[in-house]
Amino acid sequence: MQLRLLGGLTAREFLRRHWQKRPLYVRGALPQFRDLLDAADLLALASRDDVESRVVVRRGRRYVTSHGPFARLRARPRDWTLLVSGVNLHHEGADTLLRRFSFLPQARLDDVMASYATLGGGVGPHVDSYDVFLIQGSGRRRWRLDGRTTVLASAGDLIYLPPGVRHDGVALEPCFTYSIGFRAPRGAELGAAFLDWLHERGLPDARYRDRRLRPARRSAEIPAGMVDFAARALGRIRWSRSDVASFLGEYLTMPKPQVVFQAGRARRAGIICLDRKSQLLYRGAHFFMNGERFTVPRRSAATLRRLADERRMSNAALARAGLGRLISEWQRRGYVRAEAS
């Protein structure tokens, strides 16, 4: 199906031609697009402890960054930008915008960052290590891509940038820009987290002991016996592909440190919706909800996968699949909420 969001390309065509290959500019990708929030709303978010924010001020060729939360914040008349990350965690409209990109795996979706800039505002030329969609809100912004292409973005325009493309956006008037970012964990980051995960589940834990220790001729030299012991201990660490999949599911769904869920009451009517802070993924017979791994009876699995994919489903359908008790527990934890049909 052709998507106006992608300039008339199908999702398959976009992924083949542009994804992680070359930029795409779509004028009017979101017709009649209106800002998700106003400057006062964004300033209010930037004052909160559970929200990541920063202000960038351009001073000549320098860009000075301050990090929130900000007790008192007032926009300067020019060369000033406020950026707030994870707006989708706090604003329903931002979460809806993020879900428009569901033709990509949820495991890759990260967040919506909203920025408000006054005349001349920007963060300077830079390169991102991840894919990003830039959606222009009110006002206009001039983008220079790779130092060669200039794009004048107006409300509803979309720019896709693959990793490594140098870009620089400057506000031509007070404006909003919304960035859809994607998760791209580094190998070293995954490796360190995986070793922690293995350790929590129990690793061989024998303690080093000296065997036939002799007086040290060079007291600062590391004994060969200690090197041999460390090599043997590390060599005993074993894991399977199933272990990796389980770790990854828990890792990818783990809420960010600042996320707090509001406990609710169990309701058996209406439509069940995943809270916008919740992440429900699956792999094979295993499901992962907000950092926890679990399984369900085979007769329930297809229904739960559908809830994960669509993020909403009738409470009655979930109950018929034998998931009523699980959904009630999630309502009490604040992971899901019930809405009127």
Please report, for each region that a protein language model flagged, where it lies by residue.
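Short acidic (Asp/Glu) and glycine-rich catalytic loops that position anionic groups and cofactors
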Residues: 22-23, 171-174, 203-214, 284
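N-terminal auxiliary "cap/dimerization" subdomain that precedes the catalytic jelly-roll/cupin core
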Residues: 1-63, 285-341
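Generic recognition of stable, solvent-exposed alpha-helical segments in well-folded globular domains
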Residues: 154, 189-190, 225, 322-325
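Proline-centered helix-kink/hinge sites
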Residues: 23, 162-163
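Active-site region of the double-stranded beta-helix
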Residues: 1-17, 30-157, 165-207
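Acidic, low-complexity/disordered tracts enriched in E/D and polar residues
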Residues: 234-307, 328, 339-341
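Long, charge-rich alpha-helical interaction segments
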Residues: 195-250
